[in-house]
């Protein structure tokens, strides 16, 4: 796909150009790894000016010899704009480094001896994963080196579910850049669980089958795709893709009575962290920042028609740059389609006349696999002018071993001796909203009832209270279902037909609150978790809620640091950060593969339109001709 718009993701060819130019401009050698290569997105001002914009990449380089991170900007034409070292930063681990680390562990004699003591003589039957060590570093290794550690499972046959057979208490710690095992934790005598956990169709047979469900649109889908630009119903927006965040949405507009109206400049999920709540060996370090320490875009699946997506599908490919500078295309990285979504609205009048409209929604989605878990990111656009984000969590729960029936208060026993530790999935959406263009403010709205008396004579009356969140400290808020609390982003400079500021409201969905103590290692590193809402002025460099480089960072970066300045939020260009997620207490029904669990939020127009946009939806042709709809 050729370049058509400044917000288009960098293509395969463009990334190859960037890599070649960067090597030349910055004298990069084999020990310099491409940790991240991202589109350096133009500013709103640059986009509005309408002038030619150089295609520029933000490139993150890890120097394995010096153990330093450097960042640079460089264009597809080879113009290097800057290149600077980032003191104290450590880059995400690339797939190439993970492969090297695993090879180092597999060749280590101490690891082989430890496995042999457990009855495993063939190391090729051992599955290992590379996990960031976080900041839980043994004191003798806490000298600035870049470390990963390797949980292990036994895979007795090539098609066995290795997560059914955790090798408890055995972990290698690897210095990634020195390519050596610098620590071996071998401190448990728990037997390897032996009950298999088959899930492949060839193993389970799939005994419950339904009749085939076909989705057929004889005239094709109702959306139009031009490059990365999408038009559907009255919506228009751009799809983006980022090596760190994965699926991104840009430039969201809704046409109202013939006029396109801006709703958002950029929408993304800027971080995903999974705090594990089990202090057992093999669990307490598992607090991965899947976005910031791995780069979700790297793990994007190639989607399959009829399995991942169903209907009249249009796919978009994506490209990512590997650590050694090779560029990899991910076929069918993003899926787009329409879904019937039941009744949009309906009313039966007293004379029996029925008006009903079926609803439809546009779906843009991608799915990533990070070790044991799959995460589906789904953005939905509705005919009533609302937007929804839904994360679909599935895959295989992480497993540990303990004695059958043991007292293990922070885990669920799935099979005799096989345990799944309690954990949370905490996501942070970064939403650069632009309600009807221009500057915005944020209002908190709560419902309350007066005491029974003059204002509430019958005891059933209630009102709403609106509070403008004027500063960053005032805008650090929690969900409160008792007060039906929600937040509305308004444009105070534009009024609707009844004199109120137009806006969109954020409605939290299924959410949770972090159980890790604030002063814990994780609590410091993921300080953004402790508010469901943050609001900041829009600053280009403030992109990730835990900071740019969470790998082995001790904490304090990102939202907690930026908001110390307590900047004003009134009538300015703002960014909304929404923290949400799930508290996962595993069930036996989550084994061997977890059914999808959902979490997310809605953005709904509130005083933005004169009336319901759903009134403009045409009636569907009734299948039963005796029914008038």
For each feature predicted by the language model, list its residue ranges.
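Extended effector regions of multi-domain proteins
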Residues: 1, 15, 76-93, 116-118, ...
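Short, non-transmembrane alpha-helical segments in secretory-pathway proteins
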Residues: 6-46, 94-138
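Exposed beta-strand-loop-beta-strand "reactive/processing" segments of non-cytosolic proteins
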Residues: 26-77, 122-176, 233, 364
């Amino acid at each position: 796909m050729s370049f058509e718009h400044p917000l288009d993701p960098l293509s395969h060819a463009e990334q190859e150009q960037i890599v070649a130019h960067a090597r030349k401009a910055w004298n990069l050698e084999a020990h310099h790894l491409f940790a991240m290569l991202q589109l350096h997105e133009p500013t709103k001002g640059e986009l509005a000016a309408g002038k030619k914009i150089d295609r520029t990449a933000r490139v993150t380089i890890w120097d394995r010899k010096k153990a330093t991170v450097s960042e640079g900007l460089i264009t597809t034409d080879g113009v290097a704009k800057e290149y600077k070292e980032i003191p104290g930063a450590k880059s995400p681990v690339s797939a190439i480094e993970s492969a090297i680390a695993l090879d180092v562990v597999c060749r280590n004699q101490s690891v082989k001896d430890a496995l042999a003591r457990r009855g495993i003589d063939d190391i090729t039957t051992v599955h290992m994963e590379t996990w960031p060590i976080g900041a839980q570093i043994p004191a003798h290794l806490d000298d600035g080196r870049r470390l990963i550690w390797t949980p292990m499972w036994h895979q007795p046959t090539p098609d066995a579910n290795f997560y059914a057979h955790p090798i408890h208490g055995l972990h290698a710690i690897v210095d990634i850049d020195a390519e050596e095992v610098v620590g071996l934790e071998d401190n448990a005598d728990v037997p390897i669980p032996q009950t298999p956990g088959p899930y492949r169709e060839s193993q389970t047979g799939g005994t419950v089958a339904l009749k085939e469900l076909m989705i057929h649109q004889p005239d094709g889908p109702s959306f139009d795709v031009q490059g990365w630009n999408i038009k559907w119903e009255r919506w228009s927006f751009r799809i983006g893709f980022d090596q760190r965040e994965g699926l991104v949405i840009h430039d969201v507009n809704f046409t109202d009575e013939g006029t396109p109206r801006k709703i958002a400049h950029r929408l993304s999920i800027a971080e995903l962290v999974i705090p594990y709540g089990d202090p057992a060996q093999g669990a307490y370090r598992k607090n991965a920042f899947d976005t910031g320490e791995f780069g979700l875009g790297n793990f994007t699946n190639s989607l399959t028609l009829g399995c991942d997506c169903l209907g009249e599908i249009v796919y978009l490919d994506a490209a990512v740059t590997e650590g050694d500078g090779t560029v990899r295309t991910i076929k069918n990285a993003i899926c787009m389609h329409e879904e019937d979504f039941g009744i949009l609205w309906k009313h039966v009048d007293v004379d029996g006349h029925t008006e009903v409209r079926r609803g439809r929604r546009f779906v843009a989605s991608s799915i990533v696999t990070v070790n044991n878990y799959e995460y589906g990111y789904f953005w939905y656009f509705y005919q009533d002018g609302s937007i929804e984000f839904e994360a679909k969590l599935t895959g295989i729960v992480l497993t540990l071993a303990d004695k059958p029936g043991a007292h293990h208060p922070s885990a669920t026993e799935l099979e005799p001796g096989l345990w799944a530790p309690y954990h949370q999935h905490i996501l942070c959406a970064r939403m650069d909203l632009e309600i009807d263009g221009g500057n915005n403010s944020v209002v908190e709205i709560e419902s309350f009832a007066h005491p029974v008396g003059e204002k509430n004579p019958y005891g059933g009356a209630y009102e709403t209270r609106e509070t403008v969140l004027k500063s960053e400290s005032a805008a650090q808020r929690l969900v409160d279902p008792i007060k039906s609390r929600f937040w509305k982003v308004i444009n105070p400079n534009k009024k609707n037909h009844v004199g109120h500021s137009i806006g969109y409201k954020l409605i939290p969905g299924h959410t949770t609150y972090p159980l890790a103590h604030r002063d814990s290692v994780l609590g410091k590193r993921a300080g953004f978790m402790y508010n469901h809402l943050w609001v900041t002025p829009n600053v280009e460099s403030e992109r990730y809620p835990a900071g740019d480089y969470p790998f082995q960072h001790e904490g304090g970066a990102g939202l907690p640091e930026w908001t110390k300045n307590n900047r004003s939020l009134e009538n300015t260009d703002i960014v909304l950060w929404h923290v949400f997620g799930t508290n996962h207490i595993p069930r036996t029904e989550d084994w061997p593969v977890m059914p999808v669990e959902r979490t997310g939020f809605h953005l709904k127009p509130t005083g933005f339109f004169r009336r319901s946009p759903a009134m403009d939806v045409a009636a569907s042709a009734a299948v039963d001709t005796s029914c008038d709809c």
